[in-house]
């Protein structure tokens, strides 16, 4: 169990990236959803001991993460959003080097570990090729391989499927599901479908605060009967936003389709639709922004 209690972080320029964040994350896949700038990466860096929070506590089992960073690192696998690699170094040699840094000193044990990981992430056939020349999906799978060195009990993946094509994204997600059966995996993303497909529990982070949390199915069920859709002309969008709680827009066959949250039909031309996690996400962000705007005007 990863327990985060009243965690806040304020940067030197006064930006409050995290504001009183509390979460309890059990074994399995946990999705952390939020827009760019919500504070997701800051939270991931605090958990990964890459920066210290301004206040609050983080505990993983009996490890005080802030006071015992080395103890946490021994149990941690981390795939950041972006990571660099040495040029002209093969996947096998780079993974072997990273295993040394992780503390696997015996050559035979390292060889066995590296071979097993490359096969697990389906990179065995390209083990002699330089990682710098890998495609985006192959590079992310290598990133997961290095995160799995040492059999970590806590794995953090930050925006792992951004930029991947659908086939690579599906392959990568299947790998995450396999890994998440026995350890705590935190998936930080702004891609709603990843959380829908993978995670048994989730939270939404916006403006540095947790604005919703729970099981995806429970959050979706709570929205049922409250989402309505209608196709409109693009030029009508501002007028609808002024009169209704428009939570999402999308294009369908060249026309703008709006989703509106309301207890009853918001007007002619609207049809009730089955809510999805994307509706939950956008409705939550809309409510958070409206609340923030009201506070700013007060």
Language-model region placement:
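Conserved structural motif at the start of ABC-family nucleotide-binding domains
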Residues: 2, 17-18, 73
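Conserved ABC transporter NBD signature motif
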Residues: 56-67, 71-72
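Conserved ABC ATPase "signature" region
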Residues: 96, 100-103, 108-126
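Catalytic Walker B motif of ABC-type/P-loop ATPase nucleotide-binding domains
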Residues: 155-159, 164
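ABC transporter nucleotide-binding domain
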Residues: 171-259
